[in-house]
Design a protein with these regions (language model features):
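Juxtamembrane intracellular "pre-TM" segments in multi-pass secondary transporters
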Residues: 1-14, 211-251
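Substrate-agnostic recognition of the 12-TM MFS/MFS-like secondary transporter fold
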Residues: 16-35, 50-69, 76, 106-172, ...
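Helix-loop junctions on the cytosolic side of multi-pass membrane transporters
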Residues: 188-192, 196-226, 435-446
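C-terminal transmembrane helical hairpin of 12-TM major facilitator-type secondary transporters
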Residues: 311-354
């Protein structure tokens, strides 16, 4: 291919990658996620089991999918991701409301397909896009591409949150129907599947963008057995490369510490808003507002990445996370939203830095596998922290011994659990530096 054709292909892939990410993330059921599962007829225990199944699926398929992307082809993995997203939404549309065992089976299949889609897309989309830019000699533009993708993804998430919450509210829908002169009315049961249908439309766009991606043909076509054998060899080679290479080793360790503690708070955010006396109606607006930080945080991250070292940026992000975690422990009514802003900004900084540094450091043939190791490690550390947090809650309850009862007890236990997070975070930070020193001594750069 000529230089102009390579450049044209690169920017074509950038556009497709951007839309793929935006619509893969824009899931209209997110603002009513738990409520929707329960309205279908699932119990809280079933909801917890399904979330566990989803996390286990991602961890199980994460690294093999990255290695398959590096051997079978990144575009093929993206097509698999788009296909799984289509099927996971179709399963929920077909699932019977209040369908007992059959309902749980449908949701289990949905969580399995969703986990496979997440694992297949993780790393393959970035690796394909970065390699096409590198082939055109434009890899220096990757920072700006990431900035735009994060900005557009945040906008897409904002609108998905707003629209998803609105279409699930029968009062809102009935008001719109009256405004347009319609005499019909709807209730909650009529709207349960509407966010799912809208997300199915997003899945169509995701699948279309995967088909539009262009990848250089493989040097050789392998059979299934040879492909799987090479996949596992590639996984082993990449694991050894990460273990013996300073920068990716440290970046993945840092990502595990930063990502897990922030995500732990994000899963508890609605309870935190309740504790600081924010009205329930504001929760969707808060989530959308936090997502809008993606309009400027990636730009700040790009400037920091260009002007400062990875270690300096890690320390800056860690300081912001620590300040946010300490602030959460005070649970100040209304004003308690401020420390949460530090954490929402930090998760975006972390995502940008990790993606940029790993893409720049990883060899082209191993890039998707390296990025999959990132996903595996962060999901693993998040799962471990979730188990530890559950144990902490049980321990705090045993210490309370009925001193406080009812909702006040629940809130007291929750606030006390938040006060442990900054100290856990400091211990993990110390372990990062100790691990780095034991593995590489006083080395500061690769």
């Amino acid at each position: 291919m000529t230089a102009s054709e390579l450049e044209q292909t690169a920017w074509h892939n950038v556009r497709s990658f951007t839309l793929f990410r935006v619509f893969f993330t824009a899931r209209f059921y997110y603002p009513v996620y738990a409520l929707l599962f329960l309205d279908y007829g699932l119990t809280l225990s079933q909801f917890a089991i399904l979330n566990g199944l989803w996390a286990v699926t991602i961890v199980f398929f994460e690294v093999p999918s990255g290695a398959l992307a590096d051997t079978l082809g990144r575009r093929k993995l993206l097509i698999i991701a788009g296909s799984c997203m289509l099927m996971e939404m179709a399963v929920l549309l077909l699932a019977p409301i209040g369908g007992g065992t059959w309902l749980f089976t449908c949701f289990a299949l949905n969580r399995l397909l969703s986990g496979i889609a997440e694992a297949a897309a993780s790393g393959a989309d970035e690796a394909l896009t970065y390699d096409s830019l590198k082939a055109a000699g434009l890899e220096g533009r990757w920072g700006k591409v990431l900035e735009r993708v994060q900005r557009d993804t945040s906008l897409g998430f904002f609108f998905a949150m707003m629209i998803g919450a609105a279409v699930y509210d029968p009062q809102m829908i009935n008001a719109i129907l009256v405004f347009f002169g319609q005499s019909v009315s709807v209730d909650q049961s009529d709207l349960i599947k509407l966010p799912i249908f809208l997300t199915l439309l997003s899945a169509v766009v995701v699948f279309w963008m995967a088909l539009r991606m262009q990848e250089a043909p493989r040097e050789e076509e392998l059979g299934i057995r040879e492909t799987l054998a090479r996949c596992w060899r590639e996984t082993g080679v990449t694991a050894r490369w990460i273990w013996t290479t300073y920068l990716p080793f440290c970046i993945i360790l840092a990502a595990m510490v930063l990502d897990s503690v922030i995500r732990q708070f994000l899963t508890l955010a609605s309870e935190y808003w309740n504790v600081i006396n924010l009205p329930i109606a504001s929760y969707g607006l808060i989530g959308s507002g936090m997502a809008l930080m993606g309009l400027f945080v990636p730009r700040v991250a790009r400037i920091l990445a260009e002007k400062r070292t990875p270690l300096q940026n890690f320390i800056t992000t860690a300081a912001a996370v620590f300040i946010g975690l300490v602030g959460l422990g005070f649970a100040i009514p209304y004003w308690g939203i401020i420390p949460a802003i530090f954490l929402y900004a930090s998760i975006q900084l972390t995502g940008f830095f990790v993606s940029r540094y790993l893409n720049e450091a990883a060899p082209s043939k191993q890039r998707a596998t390296v990025l999959s190791f990132r996903g595996l490690s962060t999901n693993f550390s998040y799962g471990i922290l979730s188990l530890m947090y559950s144990g902490l809650i049980v321990w705090i309850k045993t210490q309370e011994r009925g001193a406080i009862v009812g909702d006040a007890s629940q809130q007291s236990i929750f606030v006390e659990s938040l006060q442990w997070l900054p100290w856990y975070f400091l211990v993990c930070l110390g372990l990062v530096f100790v691990s780095q020193h034991l593995r590489f001594g006083n080395k500061q750069s690769d």
